[in-house]
């Protein structure tokens, strides 16, 4: 043995140790990611472990086809493990929402890593074997380091790496370790390598790539989280009040406010026709109409189908929202440019404060606020707010309130109904099915009688007499129930809403 | 306040008040708190030091102006303003109110910049039906909007404290309500339950004179000794004697007493302690019995209503420094510290609506040994303007947010009653009675602290619940109240001093202030203002002097 060959085992045994540690870490990362993104951790972990071990078997099997330039191959494999293992978690995070076949890509990457890791140890053993070490000694040393590395990995992973670095950064970190092993071997045995130039080039490339990934992993994560919407994001903006996100898949456009779906262009006509038209059929000569919320202009679009409507006042706090739906071509197509109609007056003001000081009477009021999921919004569903509305509603006028889902949140729904009644309104509850939302409820309210004054417009896609008759029927699982009145000093609706949605979320 | 506080002479007082204004520790902050009520906005805003110096000159100044008025009210806190309010209602217009500070309101003082926020008192529990004068006042001012078929008052829904009203931070989590209920033992929970039911029993208890054992106004309470004897022991002793030993319960009761009286469970008399829990018998058509009325500016809202029709009767920046009877009338020497001129008022009737502790200084010729029993607690109030911040786990941000075993009493969200969805800045009012030592020592300590020191004290406390709050803070203003509240210590409420102090002097000088009740709350100040007005009105209309000219104008 020459001077150099004496060094081989120590360096290479250290490689075994690192390779084993990295290999197990990749397996753990994959398992964690799979259960994190897809749920069902028992199946995911089980499949990942099985697949990974099986792939290692394939790698080991393939190792017999490697006869020459073993050190070159070892470095090559090492670099591949580092690259694939290092980027796996960020790739999986980023593609999670944009591909249908996520799990196949996951399994593919796992198999690839498994195969490479499976090649490493047999290759090393071959190298050592050629260096005239006793077979017993090789087996004993290699497996000792292999299993010690595995133990270290499995302990450090949950205790140190996941809490301190997170999955993406851990992944890059171990990719870099693999690359460092390759670089070390490359440096020490440069003379013995046939493809050293190519390998140097590759090693440096992988090292730089993974290091950049490690440094910018926070950015990758936040970008990846932005893609937790199901479809492609075509617009995103944070207004002073909310995060506005538009997505598109095919021709279907969805609007999210603070991650809550507001509409899907595919079926929003159902929601908005049901919101606007029943109200209008009961309103005697509706000329002046008030919309609270509804900055997307869809309700205005429905209102403009009535020639009698002369003036529409829309109160929406968020100017970014109303401007978007006035200017963006794709969106003005959706609302048929309704917000730019000369009949429409848009006021970006706070609804409660505006109502309190308003002196104008309206023939119809459409209330399209977000669901009462916090105490600020809960105020806009209180008896006090509804009482203020009576000062803004013409004596024969009507109100409609979007009132969350009577199926998902029956108590919340009937609480809105009860609260309207508590300030002297007669109510007419009804609900329709909107596929993107589920079964959705509205409440009509008036101080008068509900008597039909006009027919539904003919060109509607969803609402007509028969559909409306049906919508007034509440099956047993959403039947009316006793609730308290929602007041500013009890905010009971927010409590109902939280309890009911907590059950299904 | 120690005995030494009151034993100095008037001359010494006048001389020393200059120093007091410069930051003396003589416990005269209420008097000198005119501009010295240390409002800090990133720094200690200097007191109007000149007043003290010039006051000494005032005595040697010639009288610049002499005024004749029938009635003079000294002090524009709630009791003084209420007295004026009832004088006006009785058709009396010949009166003036003198206020030392440049603004009115006493403990109902509020701040107003981008937001409105209280500097002290900030809520009124819905009053008992028996408190007729207060109910009438609220109805007259549309805080009671009507009465239902059971004659129960219907309150303005914008004034009833919105839900969620109270939350308590215990071990990393905000629970709903202030009574500790998380992470406590069953035995402790049972004790809390028993304690509360005992308090409820006191709520409905009546004495042998058929009066409520505990009620508001306090003067309507029974004089049955089986209840009044409770004034002879401390609340702590009473609780121990009744086997109420649970630590969370003691914390809670102590918290309540500090909050309402600025005295600890060990200092407060058991009668006063039970009064806190048992005196409120409010009933409403649209509120729970224990609901409270509140506004962004706290009781400043009520104060403005009491004051609104008499603003032209009020003169601010006036220090009344000598009151004496002369030739059948009362002569009041006044120093106008704005114009630095001395004025004299010759009046028929004086309504004294400032704390009793000032009597030895303003009326040194009167015997007033009993004044030593009147002691007052010092407070620090911080108004903190913030951007929205992470409000923590558990119950959502509420009106009153208290940290269990915190250093202060927690904070009130002063913008809680705002209706807007768009609240980009929050206003927190943080309260802390200074009770580590006796009041006099605490006043000494408080006056020398820097803004930085107060700020870090407040932040240290708030960070227990909101570790990152500092990043969101825009401004912290601090105000010190030297004599914020009368202290209902053992024996005070049913002792003799309180009765002595209420006696009018020669039917010419009458007293009105919440300290006469021993409990510093709006209702008591209002009651004393109304009572003293009755006396004065009766003197004016039925007295032997000729008041025919009285309706004036």
List each model region and its residues.
Chain B
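Conserved flavin/dinucleotide-binding core of flavoenzymes
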Residues: 37-60, 171, 177-179, 183, ...
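N-terminal Rossmann-like FAD-binding beta1-loop-alpha1 element of flavoenzymes
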Residues: 69-96
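Active-site/ligand-binding neighborhood in enzyme catalytic cores
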Residues: 200, 204-322, 337
């Amino acid at each position: 043995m020459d001077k150099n060959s004496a060094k081989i085992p120590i360096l290479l045994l250290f490689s075994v140790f690192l390779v084993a540690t990295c290999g197990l870490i990749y397996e753990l990362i994959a398992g964690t990611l799979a259960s994190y993104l897809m749920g069902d951790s028992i199946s995911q972990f089980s499949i990942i472990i099985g697949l990974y071990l099986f792939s290692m078997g394939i790698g080991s099997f393939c190792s017999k086809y490697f006869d020459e330039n073993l050190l070159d191959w070892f470095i090559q494999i090492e670099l591949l493990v580092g690259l694939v293992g290092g980027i796996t978690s960020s790739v999986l995070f980023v593609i999670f929402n944009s591909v249908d076949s996520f799990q196949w890509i996951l399994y593919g990457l796992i198999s690839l890593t498994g195969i490479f890791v499976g090649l490493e140890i047999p290759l090393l053993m071959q190298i050592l074997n050629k260096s005239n070490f006793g077979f017993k000694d090789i087996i004993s040393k290699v497996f000792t380091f292999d299993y010690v590395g595995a133990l270290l990995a499995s302990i450090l992973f949950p205790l140190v790496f996941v809490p301190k670095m997170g999955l993406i950064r851990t992944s890059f970190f171990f990719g870099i370790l693999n690359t460092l092993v390759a670089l070390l071997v490359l440096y020490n045995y440069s003379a013995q390598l046939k493809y050293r130039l190519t390998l140097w080039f590759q090693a440096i490339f992988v090292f730089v790539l993974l290091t950049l990934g490690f440094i910018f992993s926070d950015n990758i994560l936040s970008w990846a989280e932005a893609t937790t919407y199901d479809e492609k994001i075509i617009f995103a903006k944070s207004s002073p009040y909310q995060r506005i996100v538009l997505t598109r898949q095919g021709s279907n456009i969805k609007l999210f406010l603070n991650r809550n779906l507001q509409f899907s262009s595919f079926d929003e006509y159902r929601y908005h026709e049901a919101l606007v038209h029943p109200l209008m059929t009961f309103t005697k000569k509706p000329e002046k109409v008030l919309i609270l919320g509804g900055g997307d202009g869809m309700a205005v679009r429905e209102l403009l189908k009535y020639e009698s409507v002369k003036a529409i006042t829309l109160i929406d706090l968020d100017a970014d929202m109303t401007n978007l739906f006035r200017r963006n071509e794709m969106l003005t197509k959706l609302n048929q440019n309704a917000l730019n109609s000369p009949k429409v007056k848009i006021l970006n003001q706070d609804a409660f404060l505006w109502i309190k000081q308003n002196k104008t009477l309206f023939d119809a009021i459409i209330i399209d606020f977000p669901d009462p999921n916090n105490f600020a919004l809960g105020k806009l569903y209180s008896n006090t707010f509804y009482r203020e509305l009576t000062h803004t509603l013409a004596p024969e006028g009507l109100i409609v309130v979007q009132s969350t889902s009577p199926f998902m949140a029956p108590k919340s729904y009937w609480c809105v109904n009860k609260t309207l009644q508590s300030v002297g309104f007669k109510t007419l509850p009804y609900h329709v099915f909107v596929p993107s939302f589920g079964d959705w409820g509205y409440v009509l309210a008036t101080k008068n009688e509900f008597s039909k004054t006009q027919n539904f417009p003919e060109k509607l896609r969803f609402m007509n007499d028969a559909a409306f008759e049906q919508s007034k029927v509440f099956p047993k699982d959403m039947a009316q129930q006793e609730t308290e009145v929602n007041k500013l000093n009890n905010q009971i609706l927010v409590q109902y809403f939280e309890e009911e949605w907590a059950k299904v979320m | 306040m120690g005995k030494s506080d009151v034993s100095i002479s008037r001359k010494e007082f006048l001389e020393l008040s200059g120093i007091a204004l410069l930051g003396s520790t003589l416990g005269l902050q209420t008097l000198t708190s005119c501009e010295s009520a240390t409002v800090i906005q990133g720094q200690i805003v200097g007191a109007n030091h000149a007043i003290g110096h010039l006051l000494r000159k005032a005595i040697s100044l010639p009288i610049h102006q002499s005024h004749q008025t029938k009635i003079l009210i000294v002090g524009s806190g709630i009791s003084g303003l209420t007295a004026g309010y009832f004088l006006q209602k009785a058709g009396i217009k010949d009166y003036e109110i003198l206020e030392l500070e440049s603004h009115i309101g006493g403990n109902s003082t509020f701040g107003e910049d981008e937001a409105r926020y209280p500097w002290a008192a900030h809520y009124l529990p819905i009053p008992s039906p028996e408190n007729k004068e207060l109910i009438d006042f609220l109805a007259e001012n549309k805080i009671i909007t009507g009465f239902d078929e059971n004659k129960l008052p219907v309150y303005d829904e914008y004034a009833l404290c919105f839900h969620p009203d109270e939350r308590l931070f215990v071990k990393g989590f905000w629970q709903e309500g202030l009574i500790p209920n998380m992470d406590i033992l069953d035995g402790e929970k049972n004790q809390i339950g028993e304690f509360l039911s005992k308090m409820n029993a006191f709520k409905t208890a009546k004495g042998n004179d058929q009066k409520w054992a505990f009620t508001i106004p306090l003067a309507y309470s029974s004089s049955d000794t089986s209840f009044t004897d409770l004034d002879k022991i401390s609340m702590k002793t009473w609780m121990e004697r009744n086997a109420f030993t649970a630590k969370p319960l003691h914390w809670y009761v102590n918290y309540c007493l500090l909050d309402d009286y600025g005295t600890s469970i060990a200092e407060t008399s058991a009668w006063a302690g039970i009064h806190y829990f048992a005196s409120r018998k409010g009933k409403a058509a649209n509120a729970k019995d224990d609901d409270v009325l509140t506004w962004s500016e706290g009781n400043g809202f009520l104060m403005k209503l009491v004051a609104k029709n008499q603003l032209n009767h009020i003169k601010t920046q006036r220090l009344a420094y000598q009151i004496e009877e002369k030739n059948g009338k009362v002569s009041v020497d006044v120093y106008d510290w704005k114009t630095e001129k001395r004025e004299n008022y010759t009046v028929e009737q004086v309504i004294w609506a400032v704390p009793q502790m000032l009597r030895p200084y303003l009326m040194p010729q009167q015997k007033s040994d009993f004044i030593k029993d009147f002691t007052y607690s010092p407070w620090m109030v911080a108004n903190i303007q913030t951007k929205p911040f992470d409000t923590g786990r558990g119950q959502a941000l509420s009106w009153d947010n208290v940290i269990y075993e915190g250093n202060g009493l927690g904070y009130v969200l002063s913008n809680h009653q705002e209706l807007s969805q768009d609240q980009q800045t929050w206003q927190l009012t943080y309260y802390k009675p200074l009770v580590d030592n006796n009041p006099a020592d605490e006043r000494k300590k408080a006056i020398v602290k820097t803004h930085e020191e107060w700020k870090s004290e407040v932040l240290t406390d708030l960070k227990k619940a909101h570790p990152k709050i500092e990043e969101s803070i825009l401004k912290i203003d601090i105000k010190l109240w030297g004599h914020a509240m009368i202290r209902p210590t053992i024996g005070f409420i049913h002792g003799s001093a309180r009765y002595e102090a209420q006696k009018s002097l020669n039917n010419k000088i009458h007293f009105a202030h919440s300290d006469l009740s021993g409990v510093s709350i709006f209702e008591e100040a209002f009651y004393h203002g109304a009572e003293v007005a009755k006396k004065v009105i009766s003197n004016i209309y039925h007295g032997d002097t000729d008041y025919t000219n009285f309706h004036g104008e």
